UniProtKB/Swiss-Prot annotation:
Keywords: Membrane, Transmembrane, Transmembrane helix. GO terms for cellular component: membrane. It holds the Pfam family Tmemb_185A. Belongs to the TMEM185 family. It is a multi-pass membrane protein. This is Transmembrane protein 185B. It comes from Homo sapiens. The chain crosses the membrane at residues 16-36, 41-61, 81-101, 111-131, 168-188, 211-231, 240-260. It comes from the Eukaryota. Signal peptide: none annotated. It is found in: Membrane.
Length: 350
């Protein structure tokens, strides 16, 4: 295990998002099942923490950008700063939606269409952000997720306001289409990993990478699809499972996503104005971490040494025997040498 390589590819932004979503997905089913009686404002505490860190990081980054004009010429600093501003705008719209959801659940005074209005604005903004991101080679997971789900947001709002009376299985048709695409992605990675495993021209590192990607996608998509199916059947009244048991597959998907952040390069360097990789930033603040970060562990080293020590010594080579009459070379098998039988003399009577 190499901690240095592990943390150099660490993506702190996605790790923060998945951690907050995991905590929220734990608190929400506990509240829905009545195990805890907290206010929904408290249940949404991980979401508030997520948005607070986003706003604080963008504010500090904007301050560093304004006070240090010389930083604007460093590599792709301008592109990363614009990407940070776009992400903050999307997060602020999501924050408005979450505040309206909590207010609607606690007081119940306005329509759900009004609650979902920020999401209706998020989708076109996300489409524009995706176009800009593809041109500048930026990571766009959140933007793509918001842009493709506009129809799903409309259906859910209409269903909650009882304008349409479809079953939840039909309401989530846009989600089923999206999950079908994700299942095709999983199938694609499985096929390619099998092809790489059977190919002899591929190095072991590439095989390992494709197999890891296939396992990761399976562990993310299959539990997520299971969670959605169980939730839809629970909302339609086809089962009486507790919400805690329904959310268990979602926890597995989020834990897998958290694990993938340690091998996922990326992240904007302008959050909190650090202007460098998160690993380098931590090593500068905490120098004692360098001692641990420069250590690598080889768990198979001792086993290989023991195997070399206990290896069977090579059998001594035995010189070939030349047959004079047949003029052939008889090679004896090493380790299986059998001495010739003694010469037998038979005395014949006169």
């Amino acid at each position: 295990m190499n901690p240095r390589g592990l943390f150099q590819d660490f993506n702190p932004s996605k790790f923060l998002i998945y951690t907050c979503l995991l905590l929220f997905s734990v608190l929400l089913p506990l509240r829905l099942d009545g195990i805890i009686q907290w206010s929904y404002w408290a249940v949404f505490a991980p979401i508030w923490l997520w948005k607070l860190l986003v706003v604080a990081g963008a504010s500090v980054g904007a301050g560093v950008w304004a006070r240090n004009p010389r930083y604007r010429t460093e590599g792709e600093a301008c592109v990363e700063f614009k990407a940070m501003l776009i992400a903050v705008g999307i997060h602020l719209l999501l924050l408005m939606f979450e505040v309206l959801v909590c207010d609607r659940v606690e007081r119940g005074t306005h329509f759900w269409l009004l609650v979902f209005m920020p999401l209706f604005f998020v989708s076109p903004v996300s489409v524009a952000a995706c176009v800009w991101g593809f041109r500048h080679d930026r990571s766009l997971e959140l933007e793509i997720l918001c842009s493709v789900n506009i129809l799903q947001f409309i259906f859910i709002a209409l269903k909650l306001d009882r304008i349409i009376h479809w079953p939840w299985l039909v309401v989530f048709v846009p989600l089923w289409i999206l999950m079908s695409f994700l299942c095709l992605v999983v199938l694609y990675y499985i096929v390619w990993s099998l092809l790489f495993l059977r190919s002899l021209d591929v190095v072991a590192e590439q095989r390992r990478t494709h197999v890891t990607m296939a396992i990761s996608w399976i562990t993310i998509v299959v539990p997520l699809l299971t969670f959605e199916v169980l939730l839809v059947h629970r909302l339609d009244g086809h089962n009486t499972f507790s919400y805690v048991s329904i959310f268990v597959p979602l926890w597995l998907s989020l834990l897998t996503l958290m694990a993938t952040t340690f091998r996922r390069k990326g992240g904007n360097h302008w959050w909190f104005g650090i202007r460098r990789d998160f690993c380098q930033f931590l090593l500068e603040i905490f120098p004692f971490l360098r001692e641990y970060g420069n250590i690598s562990y080889d768990l198979h080293h001792e086993d290989s040494e023991d195997a070399e020590e206990t290896s069977v010594p090579e059998a001594p080579k035995i010189a070939p025997i030349f047959g004079k009459k047949a003029r052939v070379v008889i090679t004896q098998s090493p380790g299986k040498y059998v001495p010739p039988p003694p010469k037998l003399n038979i005395d014949m009577p006169d």
